[in-house]
């Protein structure tokens, strides 16, 4: 639109435009060689319904699944059902590995909406339930819209070693009468 073009925003032109994401398949690094896609889950709406029985349909070891291609899983010694650490410079989470050819090599999927459950483990804060927002950027879609784009990031995935922390997000509060 001429009105939007008149704002002269470099990241929001007056016509439909594609902008290369700041993190994605084409910007991988040695430390973060996998592109994370934080897609919406079919079992909830954002984080709504995560505390209901619907989470049992997909979760692995009570954690959000991490879909990973067989080639990437084999390189990392990961099998379906393993608990994995998904990490980058912004954060880390634990997820249940789901090895599938439904994602292409170099890409992993951790669905959006798991309830946040941070714990300090060996001097590092790790979300033990699989909240993908711990890994994504907090930047707006454009100078005009300022919407949320928290759907991609660069990550590394490794098999979790050590004691598996308990997921506590579904615990009911103590009742005081």
Whereabouts are the PLM-identified features?
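Long, contiguous, secondary-structure-rich segments that constitute the structural scaffold
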Residues: 47, 53-67, 71-177
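Long, low-complexity segments enriched in small/aliphatic residues
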Residues: 1-53
